[in-house]
């Protein structure tokens, strides 16, 4: 396909909406992170069961996302990115309202089911970015979008931790409000990015089965190594995210405010790495070297956290390990997103988003259960030791994976709604 030009004003409008939606989405998702264990703690009879129940709630969320992600991805390829983003935002608003109202563990479980079943906003936003970006610029722009996510990650937990001093439910209700605002912005201001000629003609039933999506994605030579690496990265990072607040509470006695401030610092690191450093590193090192370097950083960060959970329960080690892990994840994920996006065509960006979201959801189903079980039964350090080992394996896989040369890829036609806005 050949590219057509877009006016500076229409391109600027699309970018402004991407910036606003990405920051609001990540801020809304992360506001609740510092308070999640403390909300759950109200409904468990034994505090020692906290890690297990947090794991169960996140696993339910991941399982539902795993089952529905291929459908949402293909919907965005058929009807556009905008409807999927709207549905995801409304689903998040409803689920967070239920979670805040609570009353029993089954209500919290229902809320996570709704959240997982409508979790298509970030993949659709990244597909939107791929629609309006030429292949050779995708890795860098995914890095910029990751930096915007970092701003949301910085603001969300800090606000959540501060509001928790008033009520642990208040950040949850704030998340619901932010999600509703996102839906309104999409309805009234977001232009569609996917041109009619780049949409698929129909949706095959086979495309909606998550295992069928995996079979096709892992069956492609240009995607196989990247998808394996993606899974190996997602599992340990998922264990970290879902066990982070519990370990901070158990090992160094932190409450919601301190946890929220550290997650905000993680967001600052994301901004620096993805917003500034990647623009310098990618042209000099290439995607493969950036990904491998990021993986090594994550492995070292997880090793530091294992020390905190076992023999060195010092806040400075916990902070250093978390920030190193965040820096490595930010670099590796942005470069990985760009590499995978370049491996498929313009009419498959939604399919790819559904495939990676489904794979990430599968890991998000396994990760909290595995982390909770290892943490409660084996040792507090076990999830982080396993995570560091998996990172080493991921580095080897990515070092041998096939990468597509972006310069050889055709450019997608520019988005129709963006053209119409000119």
Each model region followed by its residue ranges:
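Juxtamembrane intracellular "pre-TM" segments in multi-pass secondary transporters
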Residues: 2-12, 191-228, 416-422
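Conserved MFS/SLC helix-loop-helix module at the cytosolic interface between two early adjacent transmembrane helices
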Residues: 66-103
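Helix-to-loop junctions at the C-terminal end of transmembrane segments
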Residues: 68-79, 273-287, 375
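C-terminal ends and interior cores of transmembrane alpha-helices
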Residues: 90-103, 297-312
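Helix-loop-helix hairpin linking two adjacent transmembrane segments in secondary transporters
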Residues: 148-188
């Amino acid at each position: 396909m050949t590219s057509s030009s877009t006016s500076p004003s229409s391109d600027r409008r699309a970018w402004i909406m991407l910036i606003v939606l990405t920051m609001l989405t990540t801020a809304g998702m992360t506001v609740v992170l510092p308070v999640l264990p403390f909300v759950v703690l109200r409904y468990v009879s034994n505090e020692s069961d906290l890690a297990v129940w947090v794991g169960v709630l996140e696993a339910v969320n991941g399982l539902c996302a795993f089952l529905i992600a291929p459908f949402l991805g293909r919907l965005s390829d058929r009807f556009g990115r905008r409807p999927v983003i709207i549905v995801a935002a409304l689903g998040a608003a409803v689920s967070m309202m239920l979670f805040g109202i609570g009353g029993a563990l089954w209500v919290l479980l229902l809320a996570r089911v709704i959240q997982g079943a409508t979790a298509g906003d970030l993949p659709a936003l990244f597909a939107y970015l791929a629609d309006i970006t030429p292949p050779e610029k995708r890795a860098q722009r995914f890095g910029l979008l990751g930096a915007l996510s970092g701003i949301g990650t910085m603001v969300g937990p800090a606000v959540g931790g501060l509001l928790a001093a008033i009520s642990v439910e208040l950040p949850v209700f704030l998340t619901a409000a932010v999600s509703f605002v996102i839906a309104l912005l999409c309805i009234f201001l977001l232009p569609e990015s996917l041109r009619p000629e780049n949409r698929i003609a129909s949706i095959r039933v086979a495309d909606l089965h998550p295992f069928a999506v995996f079979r096709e994605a892992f069956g492609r030579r240009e995607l196989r190594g990247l998808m394996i690496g993606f899974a190996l990265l997602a599992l340990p990072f998922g264990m970290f995210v879902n066990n982070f607040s519990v370990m901070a509470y158990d090992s160094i006695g932190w409450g919601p405010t301190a946890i929220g401030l550290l997650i905000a610092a993680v967001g600052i690191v994301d901004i620096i790495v993805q917003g500034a450093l990647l623009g310098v590193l990618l042209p000099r090192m290439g995607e493969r070297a950036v990904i491998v370097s990021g993986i090594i950083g994550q492995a070292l960060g997880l090793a530091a956290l294992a020390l905190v959970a076992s023999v060195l329960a010092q806040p400075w080690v916990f902070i250093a390990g978390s920030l190193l892990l965040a820096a490595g994840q930010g670099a590796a994920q942005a470069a990985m997103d760009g590499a995978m996006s370049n491996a498929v065509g313009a009419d498959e960006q939604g399919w790819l988003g559904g495939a990676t979201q489904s794979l990430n959801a599968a890991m998000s189903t396994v990760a909290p259960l595995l982390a909770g079980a290892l943490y409660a039964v084996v040792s507090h350090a076990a999830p982080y030791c396993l995570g560091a080992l998996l990172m080493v394996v991921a580095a080897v896989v990515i070092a041998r994976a096939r990468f597509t040369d972006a310069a050889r890829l055709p450019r997608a036609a520019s988005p129709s709604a963006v053209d119409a806005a000119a």
